[in-house]
Every structure is written in C-alpha cells, then in structure tokens.
Amino acid sequence: MGLPVAFIKNMREILGEEGLAEYLDSFEKPKFTGLRVNTSKISVEEFLRISPFKLCRVPWTENGFYYTEEDSPTHHPYYYAGLYYIQEPSAMAPAAVLPVERGERVLDLCAAPGGKATELGAKLNHTGLLVANDASASRTKALLKNLEVFGIPNLLVTSEMGDRLDRYFHEYFDKILIDAQCSGEGMFRKQAHMIPAWEKQGPEVFANMQREILRQAAELLKPGGTMLYSTCTFSKLENEGSIDGFLAEHPEFTLEEIPRQEGFCSGMPELVGSRFPLERCVRLFPHKIDGEGHFLALLKKAGEKIPGAPEPAGRPGRIPAELEAFLQDVSMPMELSRIVVKDTRVFLMPEGVGRCPGLRFLRSGLYLGELLKKRFEPSQAFAMALKKEEYASVIDLSAADDRVIRYLKGETLEIEDGESSRPEGWQLVCVDGYPLGWGKLIRGTLRNKYFSGWRMNA
C-alpha cells in the first residue's frame, strides 16, 4: 500500500523508527471485526448463552466482542431484533469511557451513523434524554434507523451546527460525546480509499474544524459536566493539538484520567509543546491493539452540577379513542401527558423537552404510529422499544424457524393455533423473546407489518 510521504514523516515523529516499523507491519495483520451487545435489550451473559457466533471479548469494553467474518452476524435475526451493533473494535472505546449514568441528559454531537449514540442510549436504558445530532442531514437517516432498531425511546435526532443547538440547550447536558470528523488516518489499514482524500484535505483543515466543534460543545455542557473528544486519526494537530488549543482558551476545563487497558498508549504533550497534562489522553494504535486506532480525551467542566428539574408534565391531552384502545394492550410505562399528535402521527416525547421552534429535527421522541380512518397503526419504532411482556398478544418464533427470515423479507405467514396469545388482531412478532415488528392476524394468516424499508434484502 502506498502511504503518503508526509504521513510517514508524521508517524515517524510520533512513533520513532522502531514504532513506525511495527505500525507498517500491522498492515499485514488481519482486519478485526466487532459487535457490541445492546444491554438495554439483553444482558451480556444472556447474549453469550444464545449467541451462535464464536466471540472473543474486546478488552476495553464490557459488552464488545470480536467475531469472525464467516459468522456474518448482519444476516442473523438477532441483528434485526437490535441485540447488537456491528462496530470496529477501537471505535467502541469512546462511549465505553464516557461515564454516562441513568437519567442524565446526553448529547452525541457528531452522531451519524450511530455506533456511539446507540451505546449511549443503551447506557441511559430508557431514562433521561439522548440528543443525537449530526450536521450532515443526509447521514441522519442511517442514524435514526440504528437508534430505532436499538429500541431507544428517549431521544431527539437533530441536524444542526453546535452554535444553533446552543440557542435551545445552553449548558444543558450532563455528558457530551464529540467523535469529530477527522482525516481518518486510523482507517488507512481498512479503507485504502481514505488515502487520496487525506492527500487532498489533510490534518490542518480538520484541526480547525475540530477546535470550533469543541468550542461549541463547551457552551452546551453543564458546569460539572464531562465530555469525551475522540478521533480515528493519529495526527498530532487533530489530537493533542486540538486539545491543547481548547484548554488554552477554556481554563474552566481540565483533563481527566482515562483508565488504562492493555495496549492503551498515553497522549504525547511533547508533540505540540503543551503545558497541559496531555499524557492523560489515550492513543490506540493497530500495532498495539487488535483494532484500527483512536484518540480519546476526557474533559471536565468546573462548577457544581445542578440537577436539572424535569419540565412539568402538564395536563394530559385528549388521547384519540383509536390510540387509547390500542394502548390498553400495552404495559410499557409511559406518561400519557407526553403523547403528542402531529397531524396524524403520534409521538411519545422525552421528559424535560420543551418546544424548540426552528430546530431541524429528524425525530422528536418515540414515534408510536399513525392515526388512520377509525384505527391506529403502530410503528416499527414502537415495536422495537417494547419488551415481549409489554404487549398483550405475541407470536414468538425460534431463530431456527424459517418463518423468521420470511417475516423479515416481508412475506405473509401462516400461524398455527396456540402460536399466538390471541387468535386475531395485532401481534408483536418476536424471535426467541425479542421483538422484531408487528403483524396482524386474521383467521390463521399473519399479515406482515414489518417496515418495508428495513426488510432483509430490501
């Protein structure tokens, strides 16, 4: 592989001659593939019990595992049930390091396609608020799908610049993750097409963007809050340089220690002549770990964290009769006062979120479904947010049952007597106890209501 001369020179400065040789040798290593268990749906122990894959734990996260490409986990029904996310192993580190607690307000500022946002949502586990933002509107569609597959209800998906978010969310968030757009040097081993892009638009361009993103994030973080900055590049300008410049302009922030794992290397303040303790940052290199590479910096904002008072729920609005009838079969906890009807579409809004006129939303809350003529049609997102026991009538199929694949392809199914909780009407279709979507049972025939845009081979 032809690496740019300027890149080799930069890596020699970072690694020295011996380290550079080891790094270059890593291009002969196999590329590592990983999956991360969705702990808001299934425990790691239970997943390991039912998993058909050969898995080996990723050291820096409790719910991440290496798998072999022969296993093809993206073709298994458990993937469609949202039990795991496919993610490059070193990219699991940022969300693992950011200490998210249940009930907090969390922002993923550069969230698409959702690898880190899905883990932040799983950590919140149906509590608090997750705002998943990406400035690129075209990338937010994949982001929304991944969050909905994971069954995360307490979310806003936005497409804004950080300064626009600040109009509505100034010093609002307890935790912020910034996985900044970067020159992508950590992807050279895996995606050689990144190299020509690096030659056209190198670290200098991205470093300026990253410092602006950090500045915007600082305004969105509560006093006492914590934010995690990460990149998938090795550049000193984008890593230590960006953090050094930020700390020089923001004395209210300090660098926090990141717990070390085997293969984690310390940041290198000497690369940029910094007076700050940048050795508290972490560098991941492909010749030190089984992964592609990352940089992490954990930053804390001075001040006392004041618990955010949730916005008053207000009076319950009038729930349409069709929706009320459907919800009688649903036992998922929800405040009816947070249900909002927009034209014919019905949403369950997260706690503590007011009106944000002018903000570009792709999704505001959990999309429950649509009011049609004298009936309510539940959404795919609603099914994914439920647990099997939270709906009155269920068809639970084994992963080995060929009807599961047929269901995921959008086909009509024949259901035997006793296979459904009720003989007619809406059914929550599950695989081994985990929801996949909806179906409507009529005289032994299940009309397929799986969302057409998510179908297998769609």
Regions from the PLM with identified roles:
Residues 1-48, 292-295, 302-458:
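Polybasic, low-complexity RNA-engagement segments
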Residues 113-126:
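Conserved SAM-binding loop of SAM-dependent methyltransferases across substrates and taxa
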Residues 124-125, 221-223:
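Helix-to-beta-strand junctions that scaffold the AdoMet/dcAdoMet cofactor pocket
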Residues 138, 175-216, 232-239, 265-270:
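Mobile active-site "lid"/loop adjacent to the S-adenosyl-L-methionine
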Residues 173, 226-229, 234-347, 352:
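Class I S-adenosyl-L-methionine
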Residues 101-102, 166-179:
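A short acidic, Gly/Pro-enriched loop at the edge of an enzyme's catalytic core
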Residues 103-112:
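Conserved class I S-adenosyl-L-methionine
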Residues 133-171:
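S-adenosyl-L-methionine
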